[in-house]
Amino acid sequence: VLQELKLLLNLEALTVTGKTLGEVLDVPYVWPAWQNVIRPANNPLQEEGALVVLKGNLAPDGAILKRSAASASMINSRGRAVVFTSLQDLAQRIDDPNLDVKADDFLVLQNAGPIGGPGMPEAGYLPIPKKLTGVKDMVRISDARMSGTAFGTVILHVSPEAAVGGPLGLVRNGDTLELS
């Protein structure tokens, strides 16, 4: 795998052996038997990867979108923010019949990252409110993480996280957000 990534790596970086990464990789490259499982960069399974790094006003240091699980119709969309300030707030209000939420709103979970969580709980997969029964997907934004098997248009690992003063913490109910 490292041989395939060699052109993208800092070959001057020291390894635990005391050798540089370049020295470790300075061996003849043999086409391994697993090459059909871990594909070379010049022969990918798909043209584009499953993950996309996003940067913008809410994520100046980046965020992750699992493009392969996102709804294409939501990739370029705009919506009203419905904000949950913590995991406890989310648990208490997500299924409240009086929650002011519509299918085209963006659900935002703040303070669920490594410090705000604390400890990076697997909480980024915000459920769709029960009052929106039948809605299959919504844009969801969080500084948390989620399972790799989850699906939907979910933007995760927003950095810097809200708990350390990241801009995600400034979002309020009713703010207009745009994903593009």
Identify the role of each PLM range:
Residues 1-180:
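Catalytic or ion-coupling anion/metal-binding cores of large enzyme and transporter domains
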